[in-house]
UniProtKB/Swiss-Prot annotation:
Protein name as it appears in the record: Adenylosuccinate synthetase
EC number of this enzyme: 6.3.4.4
Binding site for substrate: T305, T306, T307, G308, R309, P310, R311
Residues the entry annotates as binding Mg(2+): D22, G49
Cofactor names: Mg(2+)
Single GO MF descriptor: GTP binding
NCBIfam families: PRK01117.1, purA
Pathway as given in its UniProt record: Purine metabolism; AMP biosynthesis via de novo pathway; AMP from IMP: step 1/2
Organism (species): Thermoplasma volcanium (strain ATCC 51530 / DSM 4299 / JCM 9571 / NBRC 15438 / GSS1)
Subcellular location, record wording: Cytoplasm
A Gene Ontology term for the protein's cellular component: cytoplasm
Keyword DNA repair appears in the UniProt entry: no
Entry annotation: catalytic residues: D22 (proton acceptor), H50 (proton donor)
Amino acid sequence: MSVNYSEDNNRTAVVVGLQFGDEGKGKITDFLSESYDVVVRFNGGTNAGHTVVVGNETYKFHLLPSGSLRTKVVVLGSGMVIDPQSLISEIEIVKKNNSNLAVVVSSNAHVVTKIHKYLDVEEEKIRSSMVIGTTAQGIGPTYEDKYARSGLRMIDLLDYKTIIEKLDIIYRMHENLLSRSEFSDPSVRENLAKELYSYGQELKKYMYYTDILINKLYNEGRTILFEGAQGVLLDPDFGFYPYVTSSNTISASSYTGTGFSMRKIKKVIGVAKAYVSKVGAGPFPTELNDDLAKKIRDAGGEYGTTTGRPRRVGWLDVPLLKYAVQIDDVDEIALTKVDTLGILHTIKVCYSYELDGKQIDYIPKHISEVSRVKPLYEEFEGWGDLSSSLLHPKMRKWEIPQQLRRYIDFIEEQIGRPVTIISSGKDRSKTVRIER
């Protein structure tokens, strides 16, 4: 079938995070997924935590795309690293609510094992003063093995002999850290291999070459939404290295993580909180460390979906947001947690930095420089409770409360991109598309 690449701008889209992750991508993907036939996730693993609230029910996704409750087909791309036990549990839960959902898992995606989780903890100990704050889900070590060409893939789980051979290779590659662990015992590795083989038998009905499938569905005219994990500021190439994640998180990663060309993507939707939050160590120019931080954290429920750890919070950082929009080539912005800031009388936004007494128009990359930047702030009046203001799924901009509208106008002027979606509260229904 011949495809006209100039057709419908909503046919394919990518949802990405514009901050340090936890921006609310799950809720936005769920909101958008009703309009898409297929939702594809392309990076990360169980280190991601996407929460969707529907009525009285709360769903927490770590592997399955957040669109799993509303769409017809979900795909886990080859750029992901998959904990098979967690995946089986998630599929069981989501099938109870969307029994007709088709789940497809890339045969080429790499597998997280108990060995990788052990290594994650041990490697974090070695980092000492440069501790990252890993989720200890085994994500980093799994990607290490992937790029060392010694990793275990989903398709390998169908052959017991291959599993044993690869586990032995992984052990020898990391013997300096594993020699004092239970995994030094060959019988323990054999039992792990049996466990992984049993997972493979259970998951084989979901496995396929997803690059072929996604392109086939596209050529058949299906609408496809790509969902990223984490955020651009955690990207190993464009974030504050080494305080980053182990997979690429930018919009272009949808190409390398699925085999679907970026030339066919019609829209990039960047998700940002109305403030900033972060889990783990690393630079955070606008971070708050006083009672106000606790007030925002508690109001916004800023505790990690995967770890339960309290998140660091701070004011919205326009320089970082501009940078993220540029890297991701964002077309429009979804702004989340606007209700959380509404509780404050005065709200600040960082519009620029000073470094060593001079105003700068770039993002320093050296950690020592970032630690010295001084945020310059613009102040805004709070907009109060939004529960009686944002009542419809679509609203004209002039219908939005004036103080919130001024905040949005400032962001749009600074970033040069429209805010097309605003989200308040946890529930799916508390999401508004701004019509112009």
